[in-house]
């Protein structure tokens, strides 16, 4: 995972170009080994990115720090192409090269449902989520419920999933060195034990609005 993480730290990193390199060469290590040939593979790529690909010293140092944090905090690094990487994402045009996962749920189980919505959930909305998940449990005993751990609909979905015994995964827009919003710290440990927390963002990264898109 070190080369994958380092690759995402290259200056002027562009995901579309990165995915093209990955799909051409097959792994983060191969991208590193063929870094001086990137312009031949991506003739229309930004000259700045091509230049930055030649020097991996700082990105590799940052990747080692990230891996050490992951090892010390039971966080798994899921790289594109790994067996445990979410298969439903692999063919997406903007599939993350690296994801960080703390939890025990199988991200590739057969039944997965995403429940997301407004941060200003009404009483009616909260009751609808409760009834929907309880009815779903009666029909499908094994479902992974995925949401964004935000206020409103998201946190209601996670809490109701846990209430009926479903595993639930929160996809967050920040590194796993902290939790946002802090008000949801109480439910996060239960999610880690019965689901998980998933992100494509490294540690020491602010929860910017752009990461939620």
Cite the ranges covered by each PLM segment:
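Glycine-biased, small-residue-rich flexible motifs in mid-sequence functional cores and linkers
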Residues: 79-213
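Short, positively charged patches
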Residues: 1-130, 134
